[in-house]
């Protein structure tokens, strides 16, 4: 067992996603059975008592890999020396709130967290943002952490990616492990574009295997894009366990690398690839190695895909303009 634990900070740690996520992290789902983990858990003051209860449960699991837990409400204390920060906590949209209100409320949270990460996180920090609106929250945190390389920030579109794989497997009768090269483009919102035109089912082009453009356009894409709303409708609460699982998947692949011959979807800072304006945090197909990601290049984008990428990118640009006007970036 490696001597030095990975210091993992989790925000919103007493929330629904946090509750599912912490036990995955502590059990070794992130880096396997040989690397201990130290959890550093951030919550707002009113939730600290509930978080103490979660820590009691973590203690009761006697996880061999869990080397320590620290909790608190001060990001400068909790992020101190963190190697990985998973920003799960965010202000949910309440009754009567406009989207601009949501952006402003979360802006304050992610501004403070970005500044704290900039001051006290470890030199090798990687920051994954799960709390919504994830792409723009990541942009705000990144903009407030000028000393951390911009490539170290990513927003979660892995849940959408996993949802897309599951739907394609169901349609084709394949196993999820048979499906490679799935891509989510754009925003983690209803405008996202799940793209199967470069995906493969057992090495064959997925769109050709499906052979049904109507299903792709009118069933697959809206099912993936609106899956979160469907889960709320069915269970009366938002998807938490699946979001925690995707958060773990995304962090693991970022740190340990993607398999040969495959890629994953991550929302990362655009360099202008595929016509996505530079500086937006948008989902792309990426490969990862040694903690760094690279956008997959050279994919052909047809008119059908182009219009959908442009639509979700326009929404991201609108969100960036809104938080710029609010003075958050």
UniProtKB/Swiss-Prot annotation:
UniProt cross-references to Gene3D superfamilies, sorted A to Z: Lactate dehydrogenase/glycoside hydrolase, family 4, C-terminal (3.90.110.10), NAD(P)-binding Rossmann-like Domain (3.40.50.720)
Active site: 188
Catalytic reaction annotation: (S)-malate + NAD(+) = oxaloacetate + NADH + H(+)
UniProt: substrate binding residues: 93, 99, 132, 163
CDD domains in UniProt: MDH_chloroplast-like
Keywords associated with the record: NAD, Oxidoreductase, Tricarboxylic acid cycle
Gene Ontology terms, MF aspect: L-malate dehydrogenase (NAD+) activity
Protein's GO biological process: malate metabolic process; tricarboxylic acid cycle
InterPro entries: L-lactate/malate_DH, Lactate/malate_DH_C, Lactate/malate_DH_N, Lactate_DH/Glyco_Ohase_4_C, Malate_DH_AS, Malate_DH_type2, NAD(P)-bd_dom_sf
Protein EC: 1.1.1.37
UniProt-annotated binding residues for NAD(+): 12-18, 106, 113, 130-132
Pfam families the UniProt entry points to: Ldh_1_C, Ldh_1_N
NCBIfam families linked: MalateDH-SF1 (TIGR01759), PRK05442.1 (NF003916)
Family: Belongs to the LDH/MDH superfamily. MDH type 2 family.
PANTHER family membership: MALATE DEHYDROGENASE
Role summary: Catalyzes the reversible oxidation of malate to oxaloacetate.
Protein name per Swiss-Prot or TrEMBL: Malate dehydrogenase
Species: Mycobacterium avium (strain 104)
Higher taxonomy: Bacteria, Bacillati, Actinomycetota, Actinomycetes, Mycobacteriales
